[in-house]
Amino acid sequence: MNDTFQMNLVNSRKKFFPFQLQNNITINIATNEEFQSVCNKYFDDLFPNHTKDSELERGMEARNDKLKLLIKNYQDFHSEKILIYNENHLPIGWLCGGSNDSHTFYMRNTGIINSYQGRKIYTQLLNYFLDYIKNIGYERVTSQHLGTNKGVLIPKLKYGFEICGLELHENYGAMIKLVYHFHIDRKRLYYNKYGHMKI
């Protein structure tokens, strides 16, 4: 990351985090170690459809040297790791993502533990996080979800995300791709090409 972007990112993080949502729920930037610890604890329970194939695992292990180089290079791009805390400052969820290209932020994964689902935490988190990403300078946000994941799809569609594709992923299954455009010129271009109406 260049110095100007890094400075913009530092200033945006100071401006937006930590932040308290309703009902004493707090969101904050996490270190890699903090984030990984929470994901390791809850990921399999929240995403049981994520399958690990032993043959693929062995193949990736054999290709490990080159994969490590790619992973290291990928980590140099802008990424965000955010943890969600309850009123006792215990982690109850996360959000992560990163640059997909120079205009697009990819919301990679969000998880909220079962006992805190259905409390509008995701909707509040989405609203605030998108303001933050726009402040950094991104033009659009994408994400992918299973078609049965109504708890995420419905809030995003209500917010203004559009369905823009489908990926048949070897690990995750059939994933619906969503896109959100921050600016009306991009949204208008999208609707004029693909929408049921022009705006």
What would you call each of these model-derived segments?
Residues M1-S37, R186-I199:
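Conserved N-terminal entry element of GNAT/NAT acetyltransferase domains
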Residues Q36-H50, L70-I71, L126-F129, I133:
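Hydrophobic alpha-helical core bundles mediating ligand binding, dimerization, or RNAP-core interactions
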Residues D44-T104, R108, I113:
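Acetyl-CoA-dependent GNAT
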Residues I112, G118-D131, K158:
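Conserved acetyl-CoA-binding loop-helix of GNAT-fold acetyltransferases
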Residues L125, N149-V152:
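Conserved short alpha-helix immediately C-terminal to the canonical SAM/SAH-binding motif I
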Residues I133-H145:
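Conserved GNAT acetyl-CoA-binding A-motif
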Residues T142-H145, L157-K177:
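Conserved catalytic-core motifs of GNAT/GCN5-like acyltransferases
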